[in-house]
Regions:
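N-terminal membrane-targeting hydrophobic helices
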Residues: 1-154
């Protein structure tokens, strides 16, 4: 299982530093938060606040699904384990994807300034695969929810 809301919050948390850097015209946009240690710290913060953000959003989405007679799309509140896994997956995958594209990334800092992933996958291809895999994930989720909903009716 994965909490898409928590995963999304983790992505937002990771990009706060680059946003501040862009607004301040900084030379380095991907600093301490774009390291493995920084990602672990942000994941912990996200995992701690996510339940308070997820509950009202899920409650509203589930109400709307019921009102539209799409109750089979309803989602339960994620467990603590799912929240933590989603936050970690969100921040660590962010590090990997950004490391392919950004020369100012040092994912292993403070232990190493190396970025062995830089340039391994072309910039546009990273976005292409994110789109394709996101689409596959969304379709898989939708089909599995539909099949489970049909099974419950039978």
């Amino acid at each position: 299982r994965l909490s898409v809301i928590t995963f999304g919050l983790a992505q937002i948390g990771m990009d706060i530093e680059p946003l501040i850097g862009m607004l301040g015209d900084a030379d380095v946009l991907h600093g301490p938060t774009h390291t493995i240690l920084g990602a672990l710290f942000i994941a912990a913060l996200v995992a701690l606040v996510a339940p308070y953000i997820c509950r009202p959003i899920l409650r509203r989405l589930n109400q709307e699904a019921q009102a539209c007679r799409l109750g089979w799309l309803s989602e339960p509140e994620p467990s603590s384990m799912v929240v933590w896994a989603s936050a970690l997956f969100g921040t660590l995958s962010h590090i990997v994807l950004d490391a392919f594209m950004h020369a100012d990334m040092h994912p292993f800092a403070p232990f190493s300034a190396a970025n062995p992933l830089l340039g391994m996958v072309p910039h546009d291809e990273v976005y292409y695969w994110c789109f394709i895999l996101g689409l596959i994930g969304a379709l898989t989720w939708l089909i599995s929810k539909w099949l489970i909903g049909r099974k419950l009716k039978a």
